[in-house]
Amino acid sequence: MAATVRFGLLVAMFQAMSRDRTAAKKRARLRALLDRAYGPGGRDDYFSALRLVLPGLDRERGSYGLKEAALASVLVDALGIAKDSPDAVRLTNWRRGGGFRNAGNFALVAAEVLQRRQGMTSGGLTIKEVNDALDRLAATENSVCLESEKLLLILDRSEKASILSSLIKKTNALEMKWLLMIILKDLKLGISEKSVFHEFHPDAEDLFNVTCDLRLVCEKLNDRSQRHKRQDIEVGKAVRPQLSMRVNNASSAWKKLHGKQVVAECKFDGDRIQIHKNGEEIHFFSRSFLDHSEYAPGMSKVIIENILVDRCILDGEMLVWDTVLNRFAEFGSNQEIAKAAKEGLETDRQLCCILEWIASYVLALCVNILSCQDFFFSNKRESYVAFDILYAGDTSVIHQSLTERHEILQKVVRPLKGHLEILVPTGGLNIHRPPDEPCWSILAHSLDDVEKFFKDTVDNRFFPTSPNTDELSNLSISLMIQFRFSDYSICYVLREEGIILKDLESKWEPGDRSGKWLKLKPDYIHAGADLDVIIIGGYYGSGRRGGEVAQFLVGLAVPSDDNSYPKRFLSFCRVGTGLSDEELDALVTKLKPHFRKNEYPKKPPRFYEVTNHSKERPDVWIESPDKQSVRFRKHLIYCITKCRSVIISITSDIRTIKSEVFAAPYSLRFPRIQRLRYDKPWHECLDVQAFVDIVHSSNGTTHRAADDDNDLKNVKNGGSFSMNLNDSVTHCIAAEKKATRQGRIIHYSWILDCCKEKRLLHLQPKFDPCLQPMHKFPEEIDSYADYFYWDIDISDLKQIFSNMDRAVVDSNMVHHYKKKYCADERFCFFQGCCVYFYHAPLVNADYNVISDLALKRVKQDLTMHGGQVCSILAPATHLIIVSVLQAYNFDMLYKSLPPAERRYLHDKRLQVVSNKWLEDSVEKQTRLPETTYSLKPDTLEEIEIERSEETVQPCNDKLEENEKADTSHVKHAPRKRGRPSSSASRTAKPAPRPVRRTRARRGNQHAKIDDVEPEESDHGETGLDDQIPDTDNISKMEVDSFDKDQVSARPVRRTRARRGKQHAKIDYGQSEESDPGETGQDDQRLDADYISKMEEDSSDRDQGAHPTAPRVVRRSRAQRGKWLAKIDRETGPGETGQDDKKLNADSISKMEEHAHDKDQEPPPGAQLITLDEQEPKGIKSSTTETPSSPKHERNQTVLRRDTAETTSSATCEKMEQMVDPLHAMLLDMIPSLGQMKTDVGNRVAEAKAETNPPWVGSSTSSYVAPVPQASASSASSSGVPAPHAGSSTQSTGVPAPDPTAGAPKKKKVSYKDVAGALLKDW
């Protein structure tokens, strides 16, 4: 089956899994692939796919010998490109950043290079062919391991290049990328091997743990539906070792094992090895399941002779025994000794070992430990320490307790000192140890036993010395210097890696880390002293840190002879952990200007002394630790030294190691960065001599001393410390602001100040960095955390100010006080203006400088006079277009803004002006009205508001009752144009929340909130039956329209500027859909009682016009009463006609009484003018044919007052008009329609005028409207003609064209009239 499954199918799964975010989706894709590609007949081929999914667990193939660096060079040869070509350099320097993408990810970098040389079509390579090619690639490495000639290495590299070249020809770039990741055994799929095993079969992980054989797992568990009986371990098959859990201190470890029998063992610093003995066949399996056959020459004979059973499995540690010092050697020499036993002393590394051995031999001769003949033959050898047994004879013992396994171990293994040892509390190493050394393993009965054993193991295991040890050490070191081997010195201390605590009743579990074994290491307890070292180089990271420096090469200073600043630095170690991402980014940003690329084999900077070892060689150097600059100032010359590098404080394991990689005599194990020392200059870093003194002081002979009674006590200032937040805790010092949820947070400076003052200080605001809501302490503290009865200083005041919530402060209040206490009004007339400056783009880029200067100047003008500049459009009150060289209109602005910001332009509060407004205001030292300079069209706001505002339900109880009476009309009323006609469409979406419109509060009256009725109640588009109106009802509704809430479509609120002591006027415009000429018959036949009730409540409610009323000006109840009273006085009782007698007498009397109580004169400065008769745009007036009735005259008089109130706004207010989008579109398409005046249109107008109220489409010679005195100049300046005598005004307040000006260029007509005119011949 694998012969037919394409590799591209597996690659597609890899790509999908790398994009998925959840592990469940990844597992599902793996399951789908296994079910799809491997059906019931192909289950035996699961191994061919899983070995590619889990390349790290495939032990049959072995090692490829190709990591990133070697793979890059082989790939360059396979592609046949020059080594100095850009692509070859890109592959070689895959970690480096710069302008490259995917830096730090070798597979992605290689895919970029391959993409330019490979096609996108797959070559149809199968999974079997891929496995065969990878087997050949691994076979070349395994065959070359038998030889060490350079020629064979070159041949091996060429053979690998040919294999990769053949794969490149049969794959595309995507498939080759995943092949390289399989070779590197790092797929980065984001799914664990445990998840893969569980998706393959529920018992797969358990079987792999005891066999470590992926093929066996795939063959035995090919049917997912059948469970497998748990298999035991077998000799010859590697077993996953049992692991230990890390603990930070002895007390926590003892709590986990409390109540159990515990054994404490020394944790050796060697290689974890399982020894499998099957007769004379010996295997040495590491924890990675690899068989280390190099240990066989030195250990096989010892194991065969001293293990008393034919078949067994031992678990232990492979170490090196130093026969000269009679101790275990330091970590790192295992492999060297194994190779020395196998190949002889031929390499340079073994030559270095010889020099070490010579120095040790001289020391041994002086202390008479060893004869000269024995030195070269028995100085160091391999030694195995077994601490557990898993198999003995023909039986697995992993299910027995640790106590029983220790007993079996003592029976099976015969210890041989320096070769084979066992680690048990009652024998083995404990018997062979010198009398003055601590035990290697003990039974712990209490926490004190554990702590004592840990201290003895880590701090007090030394080589026994004689009185002349110091002299011998000097002799040894001088001898090493004579051999030019000064990078090494002799370490007489044996510091073990830590201790292991084990439960004696526990069973041996493969791969388990559940807490039955606990490890305690010295670097978990207390690290070595912090070392202040200097950064001299950097290494690029991989993965998410790819392309950026992620690790640093640090150095030690070499002391100068003349006591001046150091001039040379030795490479010391490589460190990269310990910093957060933010700290690391800040450090790299600071050092990046001083990085210099390391172009090996060029020499490093002259300040640094390095070994040029491949593991030491950094990617970048710091040019120099210091930077001197000579400056001249008049007759004075002075030199300034600046620090280019940074000092960092590092810590590590307390054990130091000899190093061949770095130039310093010692290096550190597991170094990590503690903190950044920006406060230290470069010349104060640690020098070599001081570091050597630290090492020697820790390596000298120590004696167990009595406990120091001079340590600081916890009761120095009377307080106590608690690890847990219990009831006894009175104060808590937190590290994060999240602790504010638990209570008040106190700054640590409070403790320091209390200690300094020798008394308990009061908690002042400066000690509370996270001020809590003060409702908890209202009797002591105010809303800003200021105590009523405690004095505060400047620091307290600053803390209070810094914690104030600026959002709770009313901006209007701030502006009020700024304006009130401003010294000069000339510098605050822009107060309250938040301006967004739109920089118009320039066609010619050469004028950018001029434009930038202009923008900078207008911003300064704004801020100097109290305004604010905002960077986003949302909070802006003004949008100023800054255009220097070309005119920029609103259409250009609207098109250039993104859709998300265009909606802000429809806000009536946003003023869109040119920069001329700001310049003129600054020149006149006052804020000029924006209307003259406005660029926003008149109709933009109205149309968009009508489309975007939400509908609301009326909040008045009486109106709700009236709506119930008018339900039939609402049901049969047609919907607006463009809305779906089905009832389901209306109910599919829930009704939006009502839009509450709040008016300003006047005096002691409450602010008015009017709710607009939803669009379903719109009566402006009723059917054909509504053409027969009830004149009496209409007349009553006309009179009451100023006292009733409007129940039509949403009105558009227009707020005019406040004049003097009068309140700002708000006028509500009616949309075109509420044309009274289209109201239905049912809408006109209203009950007389209903009208009377509306009239009675006119003085108690603030309501809008009836749906059939035009757009009118909304005013307060007091103003309406005075205006109505004035109307009655002007018309008089003699002017009323017969039609007026049809009104309800009670209703009229109540209205007159209400009107006489609230009298109000017209606003000052308004003059009454008479408008000539003119038909409003294609609609013939009916007033010339039918005598106007008194009730019509009354309504016209009301409209005169409304018009006067509308037109008497601020001097520069622009007149607004409603423009229907369809109407405008038709006029643009057929301009001649604006000039047409057909009989059909007149007939339609006449027919509509018969049913319309008097204010719609009609005007008489007595139509009067007040006009502001100063409106002419302002209107002319804004581009809008001012109304004058003899002009006609529509009911919406839009000025009609002047009759003396001739025919208009574009005459506005109703789109229904246009449709009727277009369809008249049809």
From Swiss-Prot:
Disulphides: none
GO molecular function, one term: DNA binding
Binding site for Mg(2+) 1: E317
Disordered: region residues: 945-1212, 1245-1310
Cofactor(s) annotated in UniProt: Mg(2+)
Catalytic function, reaction form: ATP + (deoxyribonucleotide)n-3'-hydroxyl + 5'-phospho-(deoxyribonucleotide)m = (deoxyribonucleotide)n+m + AMP + diphosphate
A cellular component term, taken from the record's GO annotations: DNA ligase IV complex
Domain BRCT residue range list: 686-768, 825-935
InterPro entries xref list: Adenylation_DNA_ligase_IV, BRCT_dom, BRCT_dom_sf, DNA_ligase_ATP-dep_C, DNA_ligase_ATP-dep_cent, DNA_ligase_ATP-dep_CS, DNA_ligase_ATP-dep_N, DNA_ligase_IV_dom
Intracellular or extracellular location(s): Nucleus
Domain of life: Eukaryota
Gene3D superfamilies the record matches: BRCT domain, DNA ligase, ATP-dependent, N-terminal domain, DNA ligase/mRNA capping enzyme, Nucleic acid-binding proteins
The name this protein goes by in its record: Putative DNA ligase 4
